[in-house]
């Protein structure tokens, strides 16, 4: 994959992996409390449809009514991370870490008091998984994988207690694949075990065996198939899922990327839809607009439509709405846009 885009996809994959883990108990394994399930179902639906403020209200209510459970604190972290990533905003790592520390403390207390309850193992796994993810946000991949091992162990505990706890397959499958890909430079070592294929097997199993969870685990599979250059499988999964969540930007972005290696004009069309979606967001920082315009310009160059690519470069370079913080985050991309612009006019 291409430099910066590769890094962005890796970060997105990590986000999808860890945020999707939190929805794993639905339908196949539901927490034994109707009101808790209802609040979670509604809040999760708001997240999937990018209604972040409404989702936050539901999870705050959940945390207020059930302070002894870590669900509310974990899901409030999910909302903050997902919204920040979707909008291209800075992630408030310190506040999120504090919330997850509280969730982990609750989870470990529950586990200590009742170690035979599978949910208590699951709570610890989720809390530790998200703490590991904060390292991913800072591109600390080795450290993230190392600390993530503890989370993985708890997911494995869930499977030992109940082999039909398919949500653990989602977590373990995603972990096994990306651990293998991120550490493949260590493959010469005797202890290195490439489990990427096993990871795909686990995810396909979860896809076939779960209901609500398949709408979540599927995105991890899409990016894995893109990474594995199995673009048609990625497209098939994404298009099927978009029938259920047609406005979901995460799915659209994955689908567009898959089409880049199959049908560039189709990819441009989907990226344009995404661009229009971001333009409609009030009071946004325009980070994703700039990112998408650059990506679309790159696709136009590939198909020889240099005039359209130049138009987009000009729009990026003359955009005066960006704050200093956003411009700094986009500095590398803007340099590449300037280079592209120069090459197009020569």
Task: Indicate residue ranges for each PLM-predicted region.
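TPR/TPR-like (Sel1-like) alpha-helical repeat modules
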Residues: 152, 191-200, 272-276, 306-322
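Bacterial N-terminal signal peptides
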Residues: 13-23
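Terminal, low-structured helical/coil segments at or just beyond the last alpha-helical repeat
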Residues: 310-346
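Residue-level recognition of tetratricopeptide repeat
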Residues: 69, 117, 165, 213-214, ...
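Alpha-helical linker/edge segments of TPR/alpha-solenoid repeat scaffolds
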Residues: 82-92, 133-134, 179-185, 264-269, ...
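Alpha-helical adaptor scaffolds
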Residues: 213-227, 253-267, 272-284
């Amino acid at each position: 994959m291409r430099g910066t885009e590769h890094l962005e996809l890796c970060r997105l994959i990590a986000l999808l992996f860890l945020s999707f883990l939190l929805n794993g108990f639905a339908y196949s394994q539901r927490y034994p409390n109707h009101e808790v399930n209802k609040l979670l179902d509604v809040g999760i639906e708001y997240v999937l449809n990018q209604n972040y403020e409404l989702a936050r209200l539901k999870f705050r209510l959940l945390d207020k009514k059930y302070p002894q459970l870590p669900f509310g604190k974990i899901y409030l972290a999910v909302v903050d991370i997902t919204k920040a990533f979707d909008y291209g905003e800075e992630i408030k790592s310190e506040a999120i870490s504090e919330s997850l520390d509280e969730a982990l403390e609750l989870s470990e207390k529950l586990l200590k008091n009742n170690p035979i309850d599978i949910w208590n193992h699951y709570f610890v796994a989720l809390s530790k998984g998200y703490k590991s993810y904060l390292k991913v946000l800072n591109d600390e991949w080795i450290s993230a994988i190392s600390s993530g091992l503890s989370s993985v162990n708890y997911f494995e505990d869930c499977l030992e207690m109940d082999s039909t706890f398919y949500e653990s397959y989602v977590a373990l499958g995603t972990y096994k694949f990306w651990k293998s890909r991120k550490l493949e430079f260590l493959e010469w070592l005797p202890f290195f075990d490439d489990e990427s294929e096993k990871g795909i097997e686990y995810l396909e199993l979860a896809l076939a065996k779960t209901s609500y969870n398949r709408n979540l685990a599927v995105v991890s599979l899409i990016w894995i198939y893109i990474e594995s250059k199995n673009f048609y499988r990625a497209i098939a999964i994404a298009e099927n899922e978009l029938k259920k969540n047609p406005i979901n930007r995460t799915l659209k972005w994955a689908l567009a990327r898959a089409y880049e290696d199959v049908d560039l004009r189709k990819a441009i069309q989907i990226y344009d839809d995404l661009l229009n979606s971001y333009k409609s967001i009030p009071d946004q920082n325009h980070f994703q607009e700039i990112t998408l315009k650059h990506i679309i310009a790159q696709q136009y160059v590939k198909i020889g439509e240099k005039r359209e690519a130049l138009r987009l470069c000009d729009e990026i370079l003359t955009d005066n709405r960006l704050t200093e913080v956003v411009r700094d985050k986009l500095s590398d991309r803007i340099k590449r846009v300037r280079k592209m612009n120069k090459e197009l006019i020569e």
